[in-house]
Amino acid sequence: MISPRVNTRVWQRSISLLSPQAAKTESNVVTKERTYIENLSKDIATSRFRLVDENGKIASITVQPDIPICIKKDCLVSIHNLNHLSLSYKWLNFWSNLIKFRSFKSSLFHRIIGSSVLEILAAPNFQTSRRPFDSSRSLSVLNLTGTKDWNVFGKDSIIAFEQNSSLEIKSPIFPSARSLVSNSSKSQLPRKFQILNGRGNVLVCGGGLVYSIELIDESDKILVNSRNILAINGQSQLDIANSVERQELHVEGAYVGDSSNDTVAPKFIKNQTLKSAYGHTVQFFKRMRSWIRNQYEKRYIYGVDSYFMKIKGPRTILIQTHEMTTSKDNILTKLTSKGHVKKSNVNDNGVNLEKQVANDVNSKIIELANRPSLFIATVSQDGRVDFQSTSKFT
């Protein structure tokens, strides 16, 4: 559970859950904020992106007349005030995203524009096909002022954005800015990211909970797992590249000298050629042993799926926890738990047990399908929206 007001100091670093109070910075970052439906007759100077619930699962977007809003496919929940509404679609960085993410779905957005103020609800409703039990997702709002760039990582991280002449979203294939500053292969960010610059509002989502980390100055540094970074900002792409250094947490292989003179050959070897060959052979096996040990520790002790990035300030970092969901609909977990599968007698054969498990699965599916999964939204006169489960009305 994310608290809407957290501002904790750790050493000289401000770590927060993206407090709803706007900070006096160039780019305001908000993850969670109590949001109420705005009065549609009220004049709005700019589009507003706000989070409705405490868990950051749904966002409210208030849109000016004649301003297009692009929402990711399957993430549109509802639209309020349908006067002269126009719906179309937009491909965002199609070719670059197709090459980089190997998916065209990350580029497909619904384009919405109306002649009056619109109130739109959006949520990360898309599903990933790689893992059957993916992590829960939370939303975050980026209010860009045009003075800093944001790098957002992940193919499904951008949920919605307002389409204006100032906001620009790019998906570079070749790291031009980073290649100018990188003197080694360790000074680089993950390649799969999109660049946000200009002025406007962008709705992003991350796995699990989303946290904000404020690095105060250049002496303020932090190590971040590459899998957990959602977004990072900076004055420019060159500034972002200069602030990141890749670090793999594994033990380097022990140094083995190039010379074989340190290896003493057995006394029975008199020939100098054989002594030299013996020394080179021993040296080869030492290097091989060191390499095998290094690869073992790197793969099985420290892991190869991710690496750490040392990031220095001043800048803002968005971190995602990637916590896994333990859904009530996990049928296999319920069936294998105590009491759902009865122990068979010694004389029971495997066929009867298989039929029994199949019947338990079918009954559990029917039970889950009959559970109420609808929610009732009540809009009061002051514009406040309350969500209640239908189970409370039965």
Curated annotation (Swiss-Prot):
Similarity annotation: Belongs to the AIM24 family.
Protein name, per record: Altered inheritance of mitochondria protein 24, mitochondrial
Highest taxon in the source lineage: Eukaryota
Keywords: Mitochondrion, Transit peptide
InterPro entries listed in its UniProt record: AIM24, AIM24_sf
GO cellular component: mitochondrial inner membrane; mitochondrion
Targeting presequence: 1-111
Transmembrane regions: none
UniProt cross-references to Pfam families, sorted A to Z: AIM24 (PF01987)
Gene3D superfamilies xrefs: Mitochondrial biogenesis AIM24
The UniProt record lists the keyword Transit peptide: yes
Leftover remarks: Present with 2290 molecules/cell in log phase SD medium.
Biological process terms in GO annotation: inner mitochondrial membrane organization
Localization (cell): Mitochondrion
Record carries keyword Cytoplasm: no
Disruption of the gene: reported phenotype: Increases frequency of mitochondrial genome loss.
Coiled coil: none
